Amino acid sequence: MKARVRRLLLVLAAAALLLDGGLLLAGRLGAASLPEEDTAYFLDVGEGDCTLLVSGGSTVLVDAGTPEGAPALVRELKSLGVRRLDAVIATHPHADHIGGMEEVLRAFPVRSFYMSAETQSDGLDAALRRRRLTPLVPYDGETLTLKGGASLTFLGPAEDIPADRVNDRSLITLFQTGSASVLLMGDAEEPAEQSLLRHHPELRCDILKVGHHGSDTSSSPAFLSALGAQTAIISCGTDNDYGHPAEQTLTNLTLAGVRDIRMTAESGTVALPLIAYKENAV
């Protein structure tokens, strides 16, 4: 009798181990993983801004939305397979762009942190100290090379933009892959657009992350015409208080030949695989 009980207990223990191992394996197999191919995610953070760039496993986060949306942002990043961030960029100090940074820094190991010279926040400073990160202010033309071969170049702000024009002193970044280029404008407005074209007259892009949530202070006709973008992404909240995007901005984009205009307020998070983008563009 005792022998039978011992055998039964051993069988039950073995079954429990197999079940536990199977669950663990299923958990590992079911975990999300980042794509190896170059991809741009324009995350839906309501009336805010956040973009995730992926290349060969390297990850760059540009802005982090609002404080209120930070927990949901962290959950979405984890659901996409983010486990660490190679670079985080704070374009400028407005809360709808850097409000979620503290939560992001708590949730993920971060290799490097870039910000505009004007970006200061006691909470953000404390979060950076906890991570033992020294914030870097990039220079115009500074380039980061990602594992997949893509590059991210900082464009401005130039010295001809006054320090008190916080939106126009946003860090502007150009993400370039073998197939496509993505220009992220932060909250830059028309003076910054003019400055950008003066200092980088050769600038072109396939995908434009529209400046200042589609406000009528950005996306001037001359700027859009020079860029030649085919796709435009506007990050804005549903029924927001600012009227974003402005009808004039949508008109300017259409007249400039932008064939694909997407708004996170309508589409949610927009994921754009960039491989062979030009061949597959609408």
Where do the protein language model's features map onto the residues?
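Non-globular, low-confidence helical/coil segments that flank catalytic cores
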Residues: 2-282
